[in-house]
């Protein structure tokens, strides 16, 4: 399971703007949530894939020269468009890469596994969430001091039936385990789940009904429609 970076996306956006205001060298396009795809084993050559399948190749990596990619890691990218390049939908100058938590999905059929995955609450902003064929990306707020100790899993719960269900939607549930982290201030992060393990269950579905235990409003059920868009907010 891949951990999410410790910087908030808005904070990094402000930093980029502040650093580049003087010379005019700053990303002019809306940051995108993407999947990193590696080209070589070292991770030094890579491209990004949007949730709608479009690809972006960073021919100019000079501003992120130290970055080494991990295949299928989810990340937010800041960029400018360059002249087209063969084999990719877009050619870009890459300004920053912010990796986000990249989790998995699974069917759960034992109480022991449910307990292991945890059931800690998290706030959610539905407007910033996105469901594509391959990924479910959520924008979550939760108390945190050491984010590396937090684990998230998207499950299909075969142990407990949901109180709310909708025809044509797969019932899924967010599980959050803070590990040994001590409760700190609530901070907000993108969290993305690979839907490949439950892909057969999603066939023919319009979307998902997400069960989530929130910090202030108890258990909520959110219907999310399939949408290939992947712009970060």
Where are these regions (language model features)?
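Positively charged n-region of N-terminal signal peptides that target proteins for export
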Residues: 1-4
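Sec-dependent N-terminal signal peptides
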Residues: 6-10
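C-terminal motif of bacterial Sec signal peptides marking the signal peptidase cleavage site
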Residues: 14-18
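Bacterial signal peptide processing site
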Residues: 20-23
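Cys/His-rich zinc-coordinating "finger/knuckle" motifs
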Residues: 26
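First exposed extracellular module after export/assembly in secreted or surface-exposed proteins
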Residues: 29-233
């Amino acid at each position: 399971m891949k951990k999410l970076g410790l910087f908030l996306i808005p904070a990094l956006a402000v930093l980029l703007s502040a650093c580049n205001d003087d010379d005019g060298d700053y990303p002019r396009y809306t940051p995108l949530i993407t999947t990193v795809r590696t080209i070589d084993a070292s991770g030094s050559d890579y491209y990004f894939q949007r949730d709608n399948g479009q690809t972006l190749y960073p021919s100019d990596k000079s501003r992120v020269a130290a970055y080494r990619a991990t295949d299928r890691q989810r990340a937010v990218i800041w960029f400018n468009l360059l002249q087209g390049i063969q084999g990719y939908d877009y050619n870009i100058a890459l300004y920053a890469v912010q990796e986000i938590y990249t989790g998995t999905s699974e069917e759960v059929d034992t109480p022991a596994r449910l307990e292991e995955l945890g059931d800690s609450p998290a706030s959610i902003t539905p407007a910033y969430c996105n469901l594509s064929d391959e990924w479910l990306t959520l924008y979550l707020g939760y108390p945190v001091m050491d984010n590396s100790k937090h684990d998230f899993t998207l499950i299909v719960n075969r142990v407990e039936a949901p109180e709310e269900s909708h025809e044509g939607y797969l019932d899924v549930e967010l599980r959050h385990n803070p590990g040994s982290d001590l409760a700190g201030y609530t901070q907000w992060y993108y969290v993305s789940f690979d839907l490949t393990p439950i892909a057969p269950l999603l066939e023919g579905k319009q979307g998902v009904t997400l069960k989530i235990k929130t910090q202030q409003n108890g258990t909520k059920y959110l219907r999310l429609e399939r949408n290939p868009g992947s712009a970060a907010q």
